[in-house]
Amino acid sequence: MANPTVIKLQDGNVMPQLGLGVWQASNEEVITAIQKALEVGYRSFDTAAAYKNEEGVGKALKNASVNREELFITTKLWNDDHNRPREALLDSLKKLQLDYIDLYLMHWPVPAIDHYVEAWKGMIELQKEGLIKSIGVCNFQIHHLQRLIDETGVTPVINQIELHPLMQQRQLHAWNATHKIQTESWSPLAQGGKGVFDQKVIRDLADKYGKTPAQIVIRWHLDSGLVVIPKSVTPSRIAENFDVWDFRLDKDELGEIAKLDQGKRLGPDPDQFGG
C-alpha cells in the first residue's frame, strides 16, 4: 500500500490530502471517532467553532499517543466573529487545548454583513504572531477571493468548498489553482452518496477495483488534486474511507466521473448565506 499523500501549500506548509471531518458530531462521538481515525492512520482533523465539538476534539488529541507535530488541525472562524477573530481564535485554542492551529479558515464570506476583508486582516496578524500556521477560507466565490487579494495582498492557501461528483465547481477549482489556492472538498460524498453511489460509472469502478462506491469517490477527489475531508463517526466507515492508497483512477475514469456534474448544490449559496 502506498503512503498517504500530502499537499504542499503556497506558504510552504504541508498538509495531508485526506483528513477526517467532524461536522454534526457531538463531543462524545468525536472523541471515539478521532481515536479510531488515529489508529487507522489519519493525521488531519477538520472542525469549526460552529460545530460545537472543539472540546471533544481537544480531549481526543490530548489522549492521543501521537506527537503534535504529526497532526494537522483545522478549525474555522464563524460568521458572528468576523469583527473579533482574535477572541474567537483564542476561544478555539482553549477548547482544543492547543498552542497553535495548523489551518484557520473563515467559514463563510457573509457578504450581507461585509466584514470578511477586516476578518481576513485580523487572521493575517494572528498568523504573524504564530498562533496559526496557515490561513484560508471556505465557501468563497471568485469575486470574494479577488477582493481579499486586492485589498490585503495576502492570498488564502486553501478554499474549502462544497465539491462532489454532482457539484464539481470546475471554474472555481481552476481559478483557485491559477492563484495557487489549494481547493478542499467539503461534503465530498454528496451527503452520504445519495444520487452518486448508485451511478453506473461509480458501481462499475467499484467492481473493477474491488472497492466501495465511497472509496471510488474519495479516490476521484485525490486523483483530481483535491484535499478531501469525508466525515464519519462510524468506526468501520472511518477505516473504509482511509483505505484508498492501493489504487488510482486513470484519466479516462476521471473523465467519466466528470460527466456526472449537474451543478447541484446541496449546501447554502455563499452569496446568500449568513447576515
Swiss-Prot record:
Enzyme class, first EC level, given as a word: oxidoreductase
Gene Ontology annotations of biological process type: L-ascorbic acid biosynthetic process
Organism: Escherichia coli O157:H7
Gene Ontology MF, one: aldo-keto reductase (NADPH) activity
Places the protein is found: Cytoplasm
Keyword Cell cycle: no
Subunit description: Monomer.
Function of the protein: Aldo-keto reductase that significantly contributes to cellular methylglyoxal detoxification by catalyzing the NADPH-dependent conversion of methylglyoxal to acetol.
InterPro entries attached to this UniProt entry: AKR, AKR5C2, Aldo/ket_reductase_CS, NADP_OxRdtase_dom, NADP_OxRdtase_dom_sf
Official protein name in the record: Methylglyoxal reductase DkgA
Residues holding NADP(+): 187-241
GO CC annotation: cytoplasm
Location (main, coarse): cytoplasm
Keyword terms, alphabetized: Cytoplasm, NADP, Oxidoreductase
Protein's UniProt keywords contain NAD: no
UniProt-listed Pfam families: Aldo_ket_red
Family of this protein: Belongs to the aldo/keto reductase family.
Catalytic activity: hydroxyacetone + NADP(+) = methylglyoxal + NADPH + H(+)
